[in-house]
Amino acid sequence: MFNRVVLFLLTNFAVLILAGIVMSVLGVNPTQMSGLLVMAAIFGFGGSFISLLLSKFMAKRSTGAQVITEPRTQTERWLVDTVRRQAQAAGIGMPEVAIYDGPEINAFATGANRNNALVAVSTGLLQHMREDEAEAVLGHEIAHIANGDMVTMALLQGVLNTFVIVLARVVGGIIDSALSGNRDSGRGFAYYIIVFVLEMVFGLFATMIAMWFSRRREFRADAGGAQLAGRNKMIAALERLSLNHGQNTLPSQVQAFGISGGVGEGLRRLFLSHPPLTERIAALRASNGTAM
């Protein structure tokens, strides 16, 4: 956690330096932009971290996940015992364990930190996966928590949000001034239209970057699951997913931390949070279960 806070501070500092350089190159007075930078950081990081802090509550509410407080069946007992054993092996606090009603084979992890997390599995997973395959899926989710992926994604999203807000307004101001022929003119309706369009365009590129990082993170979680449950079990779980790949019904806020993502070709692949299952299986076979 400490390393990620340091990374956050260094990244924030780098954002401010880069923004100042860009504004100087574009002929914008950086001293006039301090308010914009503060506003961008507040909105950019604020939204990401509020979502992170509320992630467990929102995930349980949006999926209808029922936390297992006292196991009532053999399956629930096995789930809790397996998560506890893997959490101890990964050096994290015991997450809450939940089951949500969903026909697809899926599971997800969420939470604000390594010691305050949630692991939930679908009823479809419990119905269609063997116990060894489900063990590997749980290991994958525990690896997400142990790697601090939720915090890292929140940091990255905050940086990207800040860039989008700042660049859209800086570039929008330059375009507006060029069109009006007056650098000192007030901001009119056209300026806000330009900024709105630029935020959508820059937001698409920011999403591509975030999803690229998310796909790399999935390979690491697969490797972590292989270490906790066994490489062959992890491969078998992914192969089972490839045979029973249905529509992902997880809410958008937890899809990135599910075991299974969407399917897409061409440009759509750039916006997927998960790599193709064939690539994940191939990476595991080539890695011998080592961390990636």
Curated annotation (Swiss-Prot):
Keyword Metal-binding belongs to the record: yes
Membrane topology: Multi-pass membrane protein
Domain of life according to the entry: Bacteria
Cofactor: Zn(2+)
Top enzyme category: hydrolase
GO cellular component, one term: plasma membrane
Residues annotated as catalytic: E141
Keyword check for Transmembrane helix: yes
Signal peptide stretch: none
Coiled coil: none
UniProt xrefs under CDD domains: M48B_HtpX_like
Example GO molecular function: metalloendopeptidase activity
Transmembrane segments: 5-25, 35-55, 155-175, 193-213
EC number(s) reported in the record: 3.4.24.-
GO BP annotations listed: proteolysis
Entries under Gene3D superfamilies matching the protein: Metalloproteases ('zincins'), catalytic domain
Main location: membrane
Details of cofactor binding: Binds 1 zinc ion per subunit.
Residues involved in Zn(2+) binding: H140, H144, E218
Compartments where located: Cell inner membrane
InterPro entries for the chain: HtpX_protease, Pept_M48_protease_HtpX, Peptidase_M48
NCBIfam families membership: PRK05457.1
Family: Belongs to the peptidase M48B family.
PANTHER family cross-referenced by the UniProt entry: PROTEASE HTPX
Name assigned to this protein: Protease HtpX
